[in-house]
Amino acid sequence: MRIRLARQFAMLLAASGIAGLLSAGAQDGVSTNGSGSRAQTVIEAEQEKAKHLVPQEPPRGEWKFDHIQKNILDRIFNSNGPSLKFGGIPTGGGFSLGPQYTRQDLLADQLTWNTYFAGSTRKWYGGGSSFDFHDLLNGHLELIADGGYQNSASVWYFGEGPDSSKSNKTDFNREFTTTHFSALGHFFDQKLTVGYTVGGLLVHVGPGDLSGTPTTEKLFNGTNTPGLVQQSNFITGTTTIQVDLSRVGFSNPEGLQLEADDSQFFDQSGLQANFHLLETQATYYLPLTNGMRTLIFRLRNETAFAEDNQVVPFYLQPTLGGPDDLRGYDRYRFYGDGNSVATAEYRWSVSQTLEMAVFGEGGNVYQRPGLIGFRDVRGDGGVGFRIKNKQATVMRLDVGVSPEGVHVWFVFNDVVGKLSRIF
């Protein structure tokens, strides 16, 4: 009896186990089929959605500025052939315009030739021609030859030093004829540039032609203004070092840029005007909010060192004032054998083509190298607008305010661009 009950119990237990296994298998099959069905449904839904996707259009304002860049700015400023030259005249000469011819595709795209002539609303005029052999030796060598002529009909002069008075505003005519031959080496993926430039400079100074403003020789003389009565001709030599630790950003670079130029002036006229001019600049671009906003800090110093018993002619002295440093002051407001300037600018991008800015600046001039420091600092502030082409500013409008009034500048360069020479 007990054996029969045990057999029945074992058979019942086995039947229950088999039924459980079959039930579990059926549930797993249903679950697997359900998961596969849901995954297939998701895939089909995504494919159907993809059929109706369209590219996202930029905001209407940004589209308009991009259209201006591609159809107007690029054709004007990046033309390969005849075009218009905006600028080309030293700042202070008024709005300038003229014809230009550029070829960027010569010698297998390794030679760029540019020739231009421009005149301004203040009767300044000039022109130049350059040959730039670039990308030689796998991009490590660049050779440049250029020549030019500038006739600046009414350059302002207020006297030398930080205490010069605005009431002593005069003007003079300045003519520069120049030629240069440069050899530049580029290393470490263009991060380091070193080079040397040899050149010649012919100078003539005469009375200015600005009506209502006395000419410089009426208020100043050769004793307090070296080079006013007689001008020198020079052979020049400039050593250049540039270190670019920046990278490409949304509309401005990001990082640090360092520059130094040391120019020797060898007087060929026997007028005791041998000197050298040391120019240094450090610029730091700090990106904010994914590069749409940028803080820019710039420090620049220019100091002229005259040899023993020599002088620095006033027409080659470093100056402060104008669209590139103290924008709240007249162009060429302060002359001296040295100057320092600090600039802070906050920029925000409306698009990659349009940018707005607020800025503040401070700077001073000194009459000999030993007086470098923070004496007699002048300051200003203001707002500005820039029209840009890729990473470069091609046009800007700045309004600077200082104790000497409000000044408006419309120019074709970047306020914190590379060091530039007037000679």
Model segments located where?
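Transmembrane beta-strands of outer-membrane beta-barrel proteins
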Residues: 82-84, 111-115, 141-147, 192-196, ...
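Outer-membrane beta-barrel architecture
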Residues: 100-102, 130-132, 182-184, 240-242, ...
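Outer-membrane beta-barrel translocator domains and adjoining extracellular loop/strand segments
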Residues: 127-131, 155-163, 206-215, 252-254, ...
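Extracellular loop and loop/strand-boundary signature of outer-membrane beta-barrel proteins
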Residues: 115-117, 164-170, 221-228, 264-270, ...
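Transmembrane beta-strands of outer-membrane beta-barrel pores
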Residues: 86-92, 103-105, 117-123, 133-135, ...
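Outer-membrane beta-barrel translocator/channel fold
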Residues: 140-182, 301-319, 395-415
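Outer-membrane beta-barrel initiation region
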Residues: 25-144, 205, 223-253, 323, ...
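Extracytoplasmic gating/loop element in the C-terminal half of outer-membrane beta-barrel translocons
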Residues: 287-363, 367
